[in-house]
From Swiss-Prot:
Its main location: nucleus. The keyword Protein transport does not apply. Acts as a transcriptional activator that mediates the calcium- and neuron-selective induction of BDNF exon III transcription. Binds to the consensus calcium-response element CaRE1 5'-CTATTTCGAG-3' sequence. This is Calcium-responsive transcription factor. The keyword Hydrolase does not apply. Transmembrane segments: none annotated. Keywords: Activator, DNA-binding, Nucleus, Transcription, Transcription regulation. GO terms for biological process: cellular response to calcium ion; regulation of transcription by RNA polymerase II. GO terms for molecular function: DNA binding; DNA-binding transcription activator activity, RNA polymerase II-specific; DNA-binding transcription factor activity, RNA polymerase II-specific; RNA polymerase II cis-regulatory region sequence-specific DNA binding. It comes from the Eukaryota. It is found in: Nucleus. Coiled coil: none annotated. Residues 577-592 have a biased composition (Low complexity).
Length: 725
């Protein structure tokens, strides 16, 4: 008998008085609510299953056919048929000289007919087991017992009185109501339901003890119906996993909750409404989990921050326990084939009925528990159990082995996260997004919009796709450590076309990098760098942004990114002033032309362009507005490169400069990508061509109010102050 579709129908008819005494007989009929005859007043075909006689004789009845009031009956009669209309055979035997009777019910199975013997503890109680295993207790009007025998594996339903003048009743499964002249107290006990999804053969023993158990990531979730059962499962889980737990959060003794819900973060949807019993869930953390931020730990944290100690990753394993009160009698169908509009209407109807009768609704208590496996523990070693309860308590299935192999291949970090989620964290950190809540926001968008379809998004409590703040902190730390060690190689394909940094409020933050190169002691030494940031109105193209964002993590990697761009110790001019830019292998060109163009570009805060095989023309415009445009126009398109593979570029410190403080210059790479270089000190530059075909830039004084050097002024510069390097 399906619990959601079948119902019990009780017909109450006033029988004629017999010669011995006036008796009332009733018919208890089990019918399928989907039957066309359901709800009609005509008498269906029934089978009497219990009869109490005045004498102690053995009675065996199997009476098909309708019962009428003309039949002479000396006792109450209850009739039961299954959903197919088939009669159920039974035998009722008396025990000794008392009125106590024993019910024997036959139910067919695959292996034949099975007899169930149910001895009642008190007289006047008849117990019937219907074939589907539902236990129905009906009390006699003369003796109302407070306790009843029941099978712990079967649900129990009692019948209570509704009204004396009622003739027909509909009893839904797990619903209690009274019959005339029947005084009953109702109690509902839940059956041990099967798992929502099939569990593998290697499911831990402690997980099999949970009702409606299902696997979520590296945890198992189910529920218990009593505190004793809950404590038993928790104790068995601790013994099996050899783990120690501490309570991080416990529910407060707040006023009873009245908000009706269908599902929550801890309770899956099963078509049964519920209210929370307690304000918060119980959260238990592993002993190697995050440390509490108490008063005594403030000094320790300050010392650690001052000494710049490494971040210590903590175990993310947690146990969640949520106590709720369920109302199974207001269940709605969960069949996915049913129209969603009908289900919503049923939900609204159930909510409205519950709001009116919430105080007297009763319900059952459930403790929903989510227990992690051994794979959920990280950053520490688990103790080996002293006494193994089974040869292989936690065998690893082929599916889990495959998942572990994929995880090890795609992500070098030991993680319970899904490999694509862990890779997304690595990608975000490599792009400069390191704030925990910013990363979590991006991860949620990634999972809900890219990984899954809208109807297939996993629940938020699945930590494989929705990691906790502690998980995100651990991953960010691991990625940063890999970047510092140079273990992580950037993939330019994952960098978006337009990369934008945003502040906490969502505003776009545009910055440029100020790079200062220091001089080495010898020509063979590498040059160290110092990086500063300044806001600007410009934006960077993807490749320079990618390059500069990685510069703060590991500075030596910038040289491998530039490939053909090699940095050498800076050259100096004869008056020992440092040169700004030196380019080798330049073809000979007119000194005045180079002087005019480059001098104008430097002083007008525009891009500095050097061609590999083409020089700048003499007729370059020297105005501030179009100097860069004229320079770009005079260079052929294939040769608009600053530095080629065989060229050497050297950038040195600038000292004692003039009016160029705060100006930004760009060096164009091979694909016309720019690196902004900001000149902090004030100076101006002039250029000459030496016999070795090397262009050097040295310092000269500039008048503060002179916007640019004219063509004639640059030609008349005293070249005696400059010499070849």
């Amino acid at each position: 008998m399906e619990q959601s579709n079948d119902s019990l129908r009780v017909n109450h008819n006033d029988g004629e008085e017999s010669k011995t005494s006036a008796q009332v007989f009733e018919h208890l009929i089990c019918m399928d609510s989907r039957d066309s005859s359901f709800g009609q007043n005509d008498s269906p075909t029934v089978l009497p299953i219990t009869t109490r006689e005045a004498n102690n004789s053995l009675i065996s009845q199997n009476i098909p056919g309708p019962l009428t009031q003309t039949q002479t009956l000396s006792a109450e009669q209850f009739h039961l048929v299954d959903q197919n209309g088939q009669a159920i055979q039974y035998e009722l035997q008396s025990l000794g000289e008392s009125n106590a009777q024993m019910m024997i019910v036959a139910s067919p199975t695959e292996n034949g007919q099975v007899l169930r013997v149910i001895p009642p503890t008190q007289t006047g109680m008849a117990q019937v087991i219907i074939p589907q295993g539902q236990l129905v207790d009906v009390n006699s009007p003369r003796d109302v017992p407070e306790e009843k025998p029941s099978n712990r594996n079967l649900p129990t339903v009692r019948v209570d009185t509704l009204a004396d003048n009622t003739s027909n009743y509909i009893l839904h499964p797990q619903t209690s109501f009274p019959l005339p002249k029947k005084s009953v107290t109702g109690m509902l006990e839940e059956p041990l339901l099967g798992p929502l999804q099939p569990l593998s053969s290697n499911t831990p023993i402690w997980a099999c003890r949970l009702r409606s158990c299902e696997k979520i990531g590296d945890s198992y979730r189910g529920y218990c119906v009593s505190e004793t059962e809950l404590e038993s499962v928790l104790t068995f889980h601790k013994q099996q996993t050899q783990s120690v737990w501490g309570t991080r959060q416990s529910p407060s003794p707040a006023k009873p909750a009245t908000r009706l819900m269908w599902k929550s973060q801890y309770v899956p949807y099963d078509g049964i409404p519920f209210v929370n019993a307690g304000s918060r869930a119980v959260v238990m953390e592993c002993q190697y989990g995050p440390r509490r931020k108490g008063f005594q730990l403030k000094k320790v944290s300050e010392q650690e921050s001052r000494s710049c100690q490494l971040y210590k990753a903590t175990c993310p394993a947690r146990i969640y326990i949520k106590k709720v009160q369920k109302f199974p009698e207001y269940r709605v169908p969960t069949d996915p084939k049913i129209d969603k509009k009908i289900i919503r209407m049923e939900q609204e109807k159930a909510f409205n009925m519950l709001k009116k009768n919430l105080v007297d609704a009763g319900g059952v208590l459930r403790w929903y528990v989510q227990l992690p496996t051994q794979q959920a523990h990280q950053y520490h070693e688990l103790e080996t159990p002293c006494l193994t309860l089974s040869p292989s308590p936690f065998p690893v299935s082929s599916l889990e082995e495959e998942e572990t192999a994929v995880r090890d291949e795609n992500c070098a970090l030991p993680s319970r996260l899904h490999p694509q989620v862990a890779h997304k964290i690595q990608e975000l950190v490599s792009q400069g997004i390191e704030q925990v809540y910013a990363v979590r926001k991006q991860l949620r968008k990634f999972v809900e919009r890219e990984l899954f379809k809208p109807d297939e998004v996993p629940e938020r409590h699945n930590l494989s796709f929705f990691p906790t703040v502690n998980d995100i902190k651990n991953h960010i730390h691991e990625v940063q450590k890999s970047l510092r060690n140079g273990d992580t190689v950037y993939n330019s394909e994952i960098i978006p076309a337009t990369l934008q940094w945003t502040t906490d409020s969502g505003n776009i933050l545009k910055e440029t990098m100020t790079v200062t190169f220091a001089e080495g002691n010898s020509p063979g030494e590498s040059i160290t760098t110092k990086v500063e940031t300044n806001q600007t109105r410009g934006s960077l193209s993807p490749e320079p942004t990618h390059l500069l964002s990685s510069l703060s993590s590991f500075q030596p990697k910038i040289f491998t990114q530039l490939q053909g761009l090699q940095l050498q110790p800076r050259y100096t001019s004869p008056d020992e002033s440092p040169a700004v830019v030196s380019v080798n292998n330049q073809p000979s060109s007119s000194p005045s032309g180079l002087l005019d163009t480059i001098g104008s570009a430097v002083m007008n805060n525009n891009s500095l362009l050097l061609g590999q095989s083409h020089s700048l023309q003499r007729d370059t415009c020297l105005t501030q507005n179009n100097s860069t445009a004229s320079t770009m126009g005079n260079l052929p398109e294939p040769d608009q490169n600053l530095v080629a593979m065989d060229e050497l570029v050297e950038v040195g410190d600038v000292e004692d400069t003039g009016n160029l403080e705060g100006t930004v210059h760009r060096i164009l790479l091979g694909d016309v990508q720019t690196i902004p270089i900001q000149i902090i000190d004030n100076h101006s530059a002039l250029i000459e061509e030496n016999p070795e075909s090397t262009i050097s830039v040295s310092q000269v004084k500039q008048e503060p109010k002179e916007p640019a050097l004219s063509m004639e002024a640059k030609k008349t510069v005293d070249y005696k102050k400059l010499s070849a390097t």
